[in-house]
Amino acid sequence: MTIKEKTIQLIDELKATCAAYGMGNDGNEYKIITQVFLYKFLNDKFGYELKNAKSEIATRIKNADKWESAYAALSDEKRKLLQCSLSPDVPILEPYHLISHLWNQQSKGDFDTIFDNTMTDIAEKNAAIFSTQTTDNTKIPLFETLTHFVTDTAHRAAFARALVDKLVNFSFEAAFQEHYDFFASIFEYLIKDYNTAGGGKYAEYYTPHAIATIMARLLVGDNADLHSQECYDPSAGTGTLLMALSHQIGEERCTIFSQDISQRSNKMLKLNLLLNGLVSSLDYAIQGDTLVSPYHKSDDGQSLRQFDFVVSNPPFKMDFSATQEKLAAQPARFWAGVPNVPDKRKEKMAIYTCFIQHVLNSLKKTGKGAIVIPTGFITAKNGIEKRILKKIVDEHWVYGCVSMPSNVFATTGTNVSVLFFDKSATADKVILIDASKMGEEYKEGNNQKKRLRDSEVEKIVSTFRECEAVDDFSVAVTYDEIKEKGYSLSAGQYFDIKIDYVDITEEEFTARMDSYRQTLTEQFAESHRLEKEIMRQLDSLKFNENIQ
């Protein structure tokens, strides 16, 4: 089996263990799966880094049959020296934190307590670097206790043993030579069962890998020589857009900033950051309401921090009536307005319009951004949507729009498009692409979905970059042309209407017209006959007084 197949098998086994203890698709299952998976990843990563440390002591670890035993046998002094030789991006684990140590403790009756204490001790000892935080600066630890999710206390120790059993016979070591694409596919598989944020729930959408790749490549380019870039996602979800963006720039050449209100998303984002080696960005992964309490501010704390790149796949509609008044009281920030609170169906409030404004406000004067929006927005005729459209066209901020296939997102049946912004306003034309007919259909569970093929991704990227007009696919238009069309960013409204001409003789034309007339005459005659027959049948109907 390949390392990818083995990793997927591990995920399946962990999920099966949860199901066996009554937590299959339980609200807490994702906490267990993501944490245990991450624990195993960090355990193996720690061993890998020990073996490759720049220290004479590391040779002893590397040559040992079992690195865990060799590490445990070191004196406290030598162990500390070895730990100090590691990168700050590597969590420090003591011998009693290791999976091998837990394995040897399984016969103890209070193994659930031992297991949980190990988790919390790792989190406490690495809290300085390996924590995220809330908008109120409350630290969110790396790990938490897990066995209490098993309701029956008598089964908790057995549950902990079952989890450890799944970890001992697998190693991530071969995966540490892999790169972004490997971990992106593993992460997508890991969270697919938890990607169920339907009904407009806030910011738990997972952006398909292909869409994230398109957004990153079009914003950054394929060979950009960038350094010290700051990237931001105000509705980060599980971090897919940010991972694609950082990979495109170069993980070592950018810092990631994020915010999201969801506790679940924060846990998964943390996992995603660690899998992709973005440990330094953990401190900027904030849990909290971006619109009400944006955490990332300028140095003086008086305005929003501005970034080189901003990406977002926000919730489209949701009930934010509880905070609407606070947002509406900030007209300078929400310059196009904030949706009113309706009397009914508050869950239909178009919160994405606030996120568009926030994205634009968060871009540097030379910054670029991209945001996923419902396709209906790009042809809006009035309201907040139209005011935003007018602003981004008049200011020359929008430089592209790609309309995606339907059912390409797991959590919404809404047709979506991606808007691209450049605050430097240097584009002469706007490239509009209609990719709605692209994609191959596939079934996931009971859902019929679509995904873009690799060749289709390449076509979208190359057409966009070249600002190329392709029949029934793309068009490059000036800002004045967009204004003449009522500020529409729909590619279809700019396509030329083509009339196909067929070269035929006058005799062929006359014969065709005679045939059409004959067919229509016969059909009209039949229609009249049926009309008379129906009326005759209706006239024959009488009311029967004898039926009681």
Which residues fall in each region the model found?
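Non-catalytic, mostly N-terminal accessory regions of nucleic-acid modification and defense proteins
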Residues: 1-214, 218-219, 281-290, 403-406, ...
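Generic recognition of flexible, low-complexity loop/linker segments
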Residues: 19, 273, 292-300, 358-359, ...
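Membrane-interface junctions
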Residues: 189, 221, 225, 362-365
